[in-house]
């Protein structure tokens, strides 16, 4: 005799192997199998789908299903698998849902994903750079002086673009007095 869990698993497997399932239905089925205790590898083995397809579908299952359905039904939007795979580049599922929600087109998804990736890299690099400068004795400039940077009252000794990787070594010229970053 098989357990209730095994019965549900068999029914899910039979349904997933139907050819008329949508990507969203496959995603939900894979998620249910995962919830029942199967691993991604086991799901791939049982269904005959590749591991990468299973992983992609499970990422689709993490999205806001109502918003996803709304975008799929919008004839002007034309949501593609490529768009959904593009969203996977964002680790934070809430941010994926926000991008999906705000996007006005397929191209807009790609643009928003790229912007988010760039912004995340800048934040990460800023954090690394601040830590490195602090260890070097460079302090954050007081807020009241922040605008002076733009009117020539400060001597800029180095500029670092946060879209680039933070250099391993930062060489600062010898200066009299405290150095600040902004």
Which role fits each region the language model picked out?
Residues 8, 54, 93, 110-113, ...:
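Extended aliphatic helical segments
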Residues 89-124, 136:
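Extended amphipathic alpha-helical segments with heptad-repeat/coiled-coil character used for oligomerization
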Residues 118-182:
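C-terminal helical accessory/scaffold domains
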């Amino acid at each position: 005799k098989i357990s209730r869990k095994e019965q549900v698993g068999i029914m899910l497997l039979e349904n997933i192997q139907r050819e008329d399932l949508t990507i969203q239905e496959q995603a939900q089925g894979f998620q249910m199998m995962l919830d029942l205790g199967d691993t991604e590898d086991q799901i791939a083995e049982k269904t005959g789908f590749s591991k990468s397809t299973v992983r992609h579908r499970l990422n689709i299952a993490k999205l806001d299903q109502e918003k996803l359905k709304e975008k799929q039904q919008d004839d002007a939007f034309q949501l593609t698998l490529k768009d959904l795979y593009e969203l996977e580049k964002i680790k934070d599922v809430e941010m994926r849902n926000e991008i999906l929600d705000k996007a006005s087109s397929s191209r807009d998804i790609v643009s928003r994903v790229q912007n988010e990736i760039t912004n995340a890299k800048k934040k990460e690099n800023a954090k690394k750079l601040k830590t490195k400068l602090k260890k070097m004795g460079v302090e954050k400039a007081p807020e009241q002086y922040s605008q002076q940077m733009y009117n020539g009252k400060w001597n800029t000794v180095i500029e670092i673009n946060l879209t680039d990787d933070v250099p391993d070594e930062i060489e600062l010229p010898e200066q009299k007095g405290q150095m600040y970053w902004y």
